[in-house]
């Protein structure tokens, strides 16, 4: 993992942060299956030389890099109002290869606007986000170096296929996507596939939270997304989903550290189906004492 960021003086009313981050891994074993049977398997190179190729890719040939890498360009602009409230606009632009690093993937990014109040109130914070991952540097990927002897000498660096890789399982943690929940995670695949099957998505998210006095608090989240499959495996019909969550908390003044929480959430649409859930929780944060010494 490597990153490089620059930030202006954060104590000033206006502050900007810009930079990029990149994560990758190499080595391991790749196994291919067909109809549940292993068809072939091979070990990928590892060692100090491969580590350097993964860490610092170069140009030229078919072995100019090693492993699987992905990352993002990040930009955040924050302004502090005179009353102490802050407004922050931010962008995270993903990349899987050189085309994304060179901003050839169009408008693809997470775009957000966030508000934070100087102190708790009816509206303590709010956020609006828009995500678009439909460009992916174009619909095709072609590199003549991948097919020795071909007469097609042109090159097309599209079909970035975010989060997926030919030789490795997708970037997921126990089947859940990393970085954004807008891309349906592999754990939801009903066919057992470990890849992301719907990474060409577009959607938005809104959230708001606040408090009514010192004992009551609320949070409301809502979002909508629409997906068209992947660049290499598009869906015949797009899928969509609407998700909503409402949360209420009670924090009695008589018992410091005690919270009683109720959440109601639901999904509706063809992407995940129609679902409804509820959560009731009692939390205590503090020191438990039984009697006095």
What are the roles of these predicted feature ranges?
Residues 1-149, 204, 222-228, 237-239, ...:
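Signature for the C-terminal beta-barrel architecture of outer-membrane proteins
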Residues 14, 85, 216, 254-256, ...:
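Secondary-structure boundary/capping signal
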Residues 194, 270-273:
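C-terminal region/CTD detector
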Residues 203-207, 213-270:
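C-terminal structured domain segments
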Residues 274-293:
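Outer-membrane beta-barrel "beta-signal"
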